């Protein structure tokens, strides 16, 4: 096992990356190795998908499946070795189907195909024991014995960034949004990474290409969500519980939440959101259901305690999943789509009957808590509608600065920085937030500036797109570059979605971003220095000193 893709990976003076019997996320060495094999097999699929475009051989089914399978290897998604093997064997079958069809078409059209990449040559046996034996060939750091560590680090930056983009591609696909050009670019990049590239400049360029592609993907996802559920609007959400049977929906998939709401109508079941599902309460086509009663719990790293105390059924629609056996709620947990845990019930399709039956069999909450309301729903339309008023307040000197404080949350005590930062931000500043990092401070009171709330919840991690649109609108209004705005991004990262959002911001030319709590372990000191110089990226330090530097700029 060697895994170094998330923020909590092992980092000591002598070791970087998880390389023991189990990773810090809880996945076993077996699952980690199988995920590497799956990724390598997917690079082989992309090789033939890219070659296929030379001879007009395109399989929509494979285009849509490949990013979904890649998503299964993201941090805290799938821990089930049998499911990962199924994905890998399906990749092998699709690769063979593509190769046969493409070679036949190339013969007919007399088209010259590229030389096979190492990933394209990679073949899987059918037996699990034989598959796992191939792990050394597929290791994400393959070649590290002879290649410079900077090359390995940049390969991983591109791989993990592309993995985050693939996750957003799958979220968009579920909502009916696909793009043939995005599929083509995805396959081109994935196939190229399967050649084990060694040019530092080309790898840096590739990371920017991934960032720009993800900007388009986030636009697609924004379209899918708003076309399906309406535009988010500022809405009050109860973060306390009420009496009754209950279902908890976690992850990111609004489609699944809608299906659950439809199928629980009239059954006396209250539905709660958890984690990144919080923004669901602001979408008109979701909040219209009266039994969508509130948001339960906080960020993903607290789920083992919070899920154990939830007296109903729990549905995990995407990342982030933790070991459910710790809190002994595995018998009430259901996984969806790419998510998996050994022994936990998995639901294919849109029939949630087993979830409903489970919820009805549980005790449910016995009494009503005193409600506590928070406000969500400052999505793209709401932000753009507020832009003229915001501009006026800036011109009048009532708003001095904007901070975007958000990203992934996690266990490390250093993450209290983000709580302290928002608490100490000047009272004439406005704080935008998104993703689960918001749970560090979103129940605190920030007041308003002449009717404009000082804390604006933009939404899920992918709703960085909305924040970018506001920044671009403000830059246009003030006739300045986006980096000349009184705007500072203070981001927390944990996994690969955060990596690709950072690449997107870099690719769009956004500079001066503060990131933490620690630097990605796969980036060497040399690479960090390059990124810091090129994009003026800063590491978080002391809140007081950072604020002083920001406001003095």
UniProtKB/Swiss-Prot annotation:
GO terms for biological process: response to hydrogen peroxide. Keywords: 2Fe-2S, Cytoplasm, Iron, Iron-sulfur, Metal-binding, Oxidoreductase. It comes from the Bacteria. Its EC number is 1.7.99.1. Hybrid [4Fe-2O-2S] cluster binds at residues 252, 276, 320, 408, 436, 461, 495, 497. Coiled coil: none annotated. It is found in: Cytoplasm. It holds the Pfam family Prismane. One of its GO terms (molecular function) is hydroxylamine reductase activity. The modification Cysteine persulfide is found at residue 408. InterPro entries: HCP/CODH, Hydroxylam_reduct, Prismane-like_a/b-sand, Prismane-like_sf, Prismane_a-bundle. Belongs to the HCP family. This is Hydroxylamine reductase. It comes from Aliivibrio fischeri (strain MJ11).
């Amino acid at each position: 096992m060697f895994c170094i893709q998330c923020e909590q990976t092992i980092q000591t003076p002598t070791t970087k990356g998880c390389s023991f019997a189990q990773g810090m996320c809880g996945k076993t060495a077996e699952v980690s190795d199988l995920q590497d094999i799956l990724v390598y097999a997917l690079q082989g699929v992309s090789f033939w998908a890219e070659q296929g475009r030379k001879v007009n051989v395109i399989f929509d089914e494979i285009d849509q499946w490949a990013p979904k399978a890649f998503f299964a290897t993201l941090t805290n998604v799938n821990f089930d070795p049998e499911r990962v093997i199924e994905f890998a064997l399906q990749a092998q079958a699709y690769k063979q189907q593509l190769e046969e069809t493409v070679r036949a078409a190339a013969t007919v059209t007399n088209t010259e195909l590229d030389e096979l990449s190492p990933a394209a040559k990679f073949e899987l046996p059918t037996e699990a024991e034989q598959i796992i034996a191939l792990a050394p060939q597929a290791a994400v750091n393959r070649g590290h014995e002879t290649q410079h560590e900077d090359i390995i680090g940049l390969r991983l930056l591109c791989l993990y960034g592309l993995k985050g983009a693939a996750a957003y591609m799958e979220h968009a696909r579920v909502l009916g949004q696909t793009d043939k050009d995005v599929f083509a670019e995805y396959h081109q990049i994935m196939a190229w990474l399967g050649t084990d590239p060694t040019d530092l400049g080309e790898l840096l360029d590739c990371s920017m290409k991934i960032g720009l592609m993800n900007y388009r993907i986030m636009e697609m996802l924004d379209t899918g969500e708003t076309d399906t559920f309406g535009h988010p609007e500022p809405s009050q959400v109860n973060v306390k519980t009420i009496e009754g049977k209950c279902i908890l929906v976690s992850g990111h998939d609004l489609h699944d939440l809608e299906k659950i709401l439809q199928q629980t109508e009239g059954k006396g079941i209250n539905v709660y959101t958890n984690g990144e599902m919080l923004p669901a309460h602001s979408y008109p086509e979701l909040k219209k259901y009266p039994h969508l009663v509130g948001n339960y719990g906080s960020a993903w790293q607290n789920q083992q305690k919070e899920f154990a105390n939830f007296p109903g059924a729990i549905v995990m629609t995407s990342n982030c999943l933790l070991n459910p056996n710790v809190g002994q709620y595995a018998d009430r947990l259901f996984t969806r789509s790419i998510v998996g845990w050994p022994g936990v019930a998995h639901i294919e399709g849109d029939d949630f009957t087993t979830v409903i039956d489970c919820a009805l069999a549980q005790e449910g909450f016995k009494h009503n808590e005193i409600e506590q309301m928070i406000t969500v729903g400052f999505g793209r339309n709401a932000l753009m509608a507020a832009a003229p008023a915001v501009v006026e307040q800036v011109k009048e000197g009532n708003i001095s600065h904007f901070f975007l404080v958000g990203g992934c949350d996690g266990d490390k005590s250093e993450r209290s920085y983000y709580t302290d930062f928002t608490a100490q931000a000047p009272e004439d500043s406005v704080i935008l937030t998104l993703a689960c990092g918001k749970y560090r401070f979103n129940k605190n009171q920030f007041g308003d500036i002449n009717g404009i709330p000082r804390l604006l919840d933009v939404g899920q991690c992918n709703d960085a797109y909305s924040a970018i649109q506001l920044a671009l609108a403000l830059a246009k209004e003030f006739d300045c570059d986006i980096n000349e705005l009184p705007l500072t991004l203070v981001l927390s990262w944990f996994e690969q979605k955060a990596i690709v959002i950072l690449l997107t911001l870099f690719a769009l030319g956004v500079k001066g971003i503060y990131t933490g709590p620690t630097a990605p372990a796969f980036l060497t000191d040399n690479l960090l220095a390059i990124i810091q110089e090129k994009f003026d990226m800063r590491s978080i330090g002391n809140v007081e000193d950072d604020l002083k530097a920001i406001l003095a700029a």
